[in-house]
Amino acid sequence: MSDFNPSTQLIGELALINCRDLGGMPLSGGRTFRKGIFIRSGSPEWLNHNEFLAVKKYGVTTVVDLRATAELEEFGNPFKDDPDTDFFSIPLFVGNPNDLNDKTMDYLRTHHLGDYYVIIMEELGDQVCQVLRVLLNSQGITLFHCAHGKDRTGVIAACLYLLAKASREDIINNYKVSFDYLGHFLDPLMARTSDDMKHTLRSDAINMEIFLNYIDSKWNGDIRLFMKSNGMTDVEIGSLYSKCIGES
């Protein structure tokens, strides 16, 4: 693991929760992940009008909402009908995570979040690659988000970091700090969540370890094989890699 401090990626001037630039992450060969192209966060549903305008002024021109259809319908998204924003809804959750009777939420009573991340890759691989294509083809700054910016968002961030050749340790460290950045926001929700579901609000290192172990075992540690298996071409994969490292 490098001595990289993930807190340097925080974007404090925006009111989005858990908002970070993916840039600055150390990569193999002495490279660093390109700054100013991809940012991640929790849902923008909480933004007031001035905070919404500040995100646009920051340079965000594309928004990818990874939340379930039910979440988008219930809570909305201020960017959905904004004429200046290319908006994409690409759900990485089938069902409704706010329904504790949902089959995935019931599954998480006895499984790690990391097991759910594997389900995303196994069952929603096409959607994951749809997101990656949007990131490849977007101009300006692209924001991708889910509800809290740690799970579905964390899967996409991990895919990008794997493609760009960040270290396993740095990817895990970058993942697990989400709960540190969300604590103040999640405290009330944590207080009323049952003990068997509290882990779903955290970002324990074991979750990303499970995800990376899956990539190692199923895809020989090469995220490109996953991408190709789900329809991305060598040209697309190479172009996204170049964009991530600043050579596009």
Q: Where in this protein do the model-derived segments appear?
A:
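Cys-dependent protein tyrosine phosphatase-like superfamily
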Residues: 1-143, 156-248
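Ser/Thr-glycine-rich phosphate-binding loops at phosphate-binding pockets of nucleotides
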Residues: 148, 152-153
